[in-house]
Design a protein with these regions (language model features):
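Extracellular/periplasmic loop regions
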Residues: 104-109, 205-212, 217-222
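Noncatalytic carbohydrate-binding groove/subsite architecture in carbohydrate-active enzymes
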Residues: 1-85, 89, 111
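Residues that act as N-cap/strand-start positions at coil-to-secondary-structure junctions
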Residues: 147-150, 176-178, 232, 241-243
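Short, solvent-exposed beta-strand-terminating loops
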Residues: 1-10, 92-102, 197-211
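A structural motif corresponding to the C-terminal end of an alpha-helix
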Residues: 41-54, 85-92, 135-141, 238-247
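C-terminal beta-strand-rich structural cap/linker in extracellular carbohydrate-active enzymes
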Residues: 215-263
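Aromatic/acidic polysaccharide-binding cleft in carbohydrate-active enzymes
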Residues: 58-175
Length: 263
């Protein structure tokens, strides 16, 4: 679904991109989009089409080609929220679009300019790309679990692994964290890891800023950005008691956690 943005935020007017954002009133988050706009729409359309297959072939969080949130974990959290909560209504979908190389609009010179893509024009993977990769790697067998009010959760079985994906979409980006306690009946695991997408992990925008915001990164800079912003697995402490795995983590606004339990 498409939306305009709320709040003008802090905008740099010294460049074409900054002037465009100021002229368009581009802020940091959608202002006309509810968390469940896509899900509610898909459910209504599914009732209309009945047994016919339903595909959403072009969707995204924001219609502004320059919105800062398109380059952040907010986009990733939105994509996961839509996918995890629309699976019963739609048969397939395609996020619009894969790359910031967008033929319908001129290209801004900045590598990170709020483009629609899952990757920048030089191929740097954004947080949304990694979030969808988490889903792709999780396997095809999903467990039925209750939906929470603020945190989206999904559990998948893949051979000798269990993948748990957590996401917390919050357009207002409020402070505060949710504590997640997990109890899972299972054989004793050999290892439990967590991968994070947030301000400090899998955030290529921050790494790009750290290397001087090059408009066209050279090969060395591209390699550094890719390496530093790739999600990493970290050991997650756990207990195994009475045939159950007990573990906990926390999550904040527009953050994502991928937990893998290996046996």
């Amino acid at each position: 679904m498409l939306a305009a943005l709320r709040g003008k935020g802090t905008l740099d007017r010294s460049s074409i991109l900054g002037l465009y954002r100021a002229f368009m009133g581009v802020g940091d988050a959608p202002k006309t989009l509810r968390r469940d706009t896509f899900t509610d729409s898909a459910q209504r359309v599914k009732k209309l089409v009945g047994e016919l297959p339903l595909y959403y072939t072009e969707w995204n969080m924001c219609a502004n080609f320059s919105a800062p949130c398109n380059d952040t974990s907010m986009q990733a959290a939105y994509d996961l929220h839509v996918i995890l909560n629309s699976d019963d209504s739609i048969d397939g979908s395609s996020i619009w679009c894969f790359s910031d190389l967008f033929e319908e609009f001129h290209q801004f010179p900045e590598e990170f300019h709020g483009g629609f893509g899952l990757m920048t024009q030089s191929g740097i993977k954004k947080p949304a790309y990694h979030a969808l990769r988490f889903l792709n790697e999780a396997g095809d067998t999903a467990y039925e679990i209750p939906h929470g009010d603020s945190v989206d959760a999904a559990v998948f079985k893949k051979e000798n692994e269990t993948h748990i994906i957590l996401s917390m979409l919050d357009f207002d980006a409020k402070d505060g964290r949710e504590q997640i306690n997990i109890s899972l009946e299972s054989d004793e695991p050999s290892a439990v890891t967590v991968s994070k997408i947030d301000a400090d992990h899998a955030n290529p925008l921050r790494v790009w800023e750290g290397v001087g915001r090059p408009q066209v990164p050279n090969r060395s800079q591209l390699s550094e950005i890719e390496e530093e912003s790739a999600p990493r697995e970290e050991a997650l402490p756990f207990e195994y008691r009475d045939g159950k795995i007990l573990l906990n983590t926390d999550i904040g606004a527009n953050e994502i956690r991928r937990i893998i339990i290996r046996r």
